[in-house]
Amino acid sequence: MVDVDTGRFTVGVFQDVKWAQKGIDALRRAGLAPESISIIAKESAEVGALIEATLGAQGERIETSATGPLLARGPLVAALQGPARDLAKLGLSGTLRRVGFQAHDGRIFETLTARGGVLVSVHSEPRAADALAVLHSYGGGNAAIGAWTGRV
């Protein structure tokens, strides 16, 4: 059995850094705390600048076989790493189960990220529906809430 983080992560993938920035700005205007936001994307100077400007620190470099080198930061990254710190080995598709997503969701998020998408997540159970609405409204493709049991 897979251990699942009891907090809720709402995840969406934006087509590029420009769209991700718009979505993140909207999340912040909606009152979602910067420390609840995570960003995972293919390594680039543009992604590094987005992470640093949004989260106030540099992204961690993680290399997976499915995506190549990524830059990542935020509470989702810690949850995906797990106690074994095996995100690099298992990739997004193998670790998103830890935060309540099905394997096929993990493969979709991994594929979109490998194609240059910017994965943005929010860790906030009470505001999961709000985060989902913002992600959808600002172009966060395949936005979903991991193992969410509430109602929209």
What are the residue ranges of the model-derived segments?
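Positively charged, small/polar-rich N-terminal and surface patches that mediate targeting and assembly
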Residues: M1-V152
